[in-house]
């Protein structure tokens, strides 16, 4: 149990996919203008990342490795992610039409989110077992969601703040993301792998 807790804390805080590994920056910058949208995107990404991580592990363990098709890993994982995203899109459309409209084009873009593919590839490269894959996928998604919600809350405050003209919009957003990344560097050394 301690191993899974360390994996969770290490992935969420120490090795955050957005602020440390710089994966998933497109939705991080694009969907974080409103807190409501960021929460929805975080939930959708959490579902997709966790499910895609487990499915990718199963495809790798039960199909690619036994058949010696390791060279097809990236292509196979992209297909797995596309199927999981389509399934998620159907679920979100049926359960929350408002969230589906708010997420707009960003929901199908989860397919091309490099964080999802990155988690799947790192998962198999680190030789995780099934349970570790599930925890790693969920932890990466939790870290992504945490950073996204914090960033959206800050951006909402910045939207009404008196920011100098040269720093408005994207400039202040990038500066804020950099400062958040520096803050997360404070967690370095918290968990040793």
Curated annotation (Swiss-Prot):
Part of a membrane-bound complex that couples electron transfer with translocation of ions across the membrane. The complex is composed of six subunits: RnfA, RnfB, RnfC, RnfD, RnfE and RnfG. One of its GO terms (cellular component) is plasma membrane. The gene is rnfA. GO terms for biological process: electron transport chain. The chain crosses the membrane at residues 5-25, 39-59, 62-82, 102-122, 134-154, 171-191. It comes from Yersinia pestis (strain Pestoides F). It comes from the Bacteria. It is found in: Cell inner membrane. This is Ion-translocating oxidoreductase complex subunit A. Belongs to the NqrDE/RnfAE family. Its EC number is 7.-.-.-. NCBIfam families: PRK05151.1, rnfA. Its main location: membrane. HAMAP family: RsxA_RnfA. PANTHER family: INTEGRAL MEMBRANE PROTEIN OF SOXR-REDUCING COMPLEX, ION-TRANSLOCATING OXIDOREDUCTASE COMPLEX SUBUNIT A. Keywords: Cell inner membrane, Cell membrane, Electron transport, Membrane, Translocase, Transmembrane, Transmembrane helix, Transport. InterPro entries: Ion_transpt_RnfA/RsxA, NqrDE/RnfAE, NqrDE/RnfAE_oxidrdctase.
